[in-house]
């Protein structure tokens, strides 16, 4: 399947979670076996080209795509979690959201010093979470140069923000709006 075929599998839900928002729902994409498999193939191809030695994904939808890409490539997966979800000593990073703050944590023993880690997530909007994840992975010793997404919302400038921080950013598709 082409990326245009995959784009047609993404459902748009108007006015969710608030009026004026066009929510890009991946449920219809991941429910389509051939579509999900093709999506993982496309992302794995990009991760392989980036020289990935491991894949990281952010909770929650980044787990869907990141773990599948890692499995397809025979690589390990590093879950980037919300606070308090890991049963071991973690390292974390606080970061700003549009309205407030949040925190990400990882198990630093999941990363080897200098290991090339590619970030995979479902969607990039403002880029804040991906930027924080890249910084956190680097704090643990990872070499992070690439972030891959299924969907980019270019009007929110997240990809530009990540590129400005030195990351190569690729998405399988983009959609207008927020």
From Swiss-Prot:
<dbReference type="GO" id="GO:0006168">
    <property type="term" value="P:adenine salvage"/>
</dbReference>
<comment type="function">
    <text>Catalyzes a salvage reaction resulting in the formation of AMP, that is energically less costly than de novo synthesis.</text>
</comment>
<keyword id="KW-0328">Glycosyltransferase</keyword>
<dbReference type="GO" id="GO:0005737">
    <property type="term" value="C:cytoplasm"/>
</dbReference>
<comment type="pathway">
    <text>Purine metabolism; AMP biosynthesis via salvage pathway; AMP from adenine: step 1/1.</text>
</comment>
<dbReference type="InterPro" id="IPR050054">
    <property type="entry name" value="UPRTase/APRTase"/>
</dbReference>
<dbReference type="GO" id="GO:0003999">
    <property type="term" value="F:adenine phosphoribosyltransferase activity"/>
</dbReference>
<dbReference type="InterPro" id="IPR029057">
    <property type="entry name" value="PRTase-like"/>
</dbReference>
<dbReference type="GO" id="GO:0002055">
    <property type="term" value="F:adenine binding"/>
</dbReference>
<dbReference type="InterPro" id="IPR005764">
    <property type="entry name" value="Ade_phspho_trans"/>
</dbReference>
<dbReference type="GO" id="GO:0006166">
    <property type="term" value="P:purine ribonucleoside salvage"/>
</dbReference>
<keyword id="KW-0808">Transferase</keyword>
<keyword id="KW-0660">Purine salvage</keyword>
<dbReference type="InterPro" id="IPR000836">
    <property type="entry name" value="PRibTrfase_dom"/>
</dbReference>
<dbReference type="GO" id="GO:0016208">
    <property type="term" value="F:AMP binding"/>
</dbReference>
<comment type="similarity">
    <text>Belongs to the purine/pyrimidine phosphoribosyltransferase family.</text>
</comment>
<dbReference type="GO" id="GO:0044209">
    <property type="term" value="P:AMP salvage"/>
</dbReference>
<protein>
    <recommendedName>
        <fullName>Adenine phosphoribosyltransferase</fullName>
        <ecNumber>2.4.2.7</ecNumber>
    </recommendedName>
</protein>
<keyword id="KW-0963">Cytoplasm</keyword>
<dbReference type="Pfam" id="PF00156">
    <property type="entry name" value="Pribosyltran"/>
</dbReference>
<comment type="subunit">
    <text>Homodimer.</text>
</comment>
């Amino acid at each position: 399947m082409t990326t245009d075929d995959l784009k047609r599998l993404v459902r748009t839900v108007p006015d969710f979670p608030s009026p004026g928002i066009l929510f890009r729902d991946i449920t219809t994409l991941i429910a389509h076996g051939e579509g999900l498999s093709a999506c993982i193939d496309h992302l794995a191809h990009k991760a392989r080209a980036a020289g990935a030695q491991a894949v990281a994904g952010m909770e929650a939808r980044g787990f869907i795509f990141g773990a599948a890409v890692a499995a397809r490539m025979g690589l390990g997966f590093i879950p980037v979690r919300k606070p308090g979800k890991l049963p071991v000593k973690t390292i974390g990073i606080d970061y700003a959201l549009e309205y407030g703050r949040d925190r990400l944590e990882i198990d630093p023993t999941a990363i080897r010093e200098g290991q090339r880690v590619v970030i995979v997530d479902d969607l990039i909007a403002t880029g804040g979470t991906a930027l924080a994840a890249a910084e956190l992975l680097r704090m643990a010793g990872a070499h992070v140069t690439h972030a891959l997404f299924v969907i980019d919302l270019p009007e929110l400038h997240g990809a530009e923000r990540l590129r400005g921080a030195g990351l190569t950013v690729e998405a399988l598709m983009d959609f207008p709006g927020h």
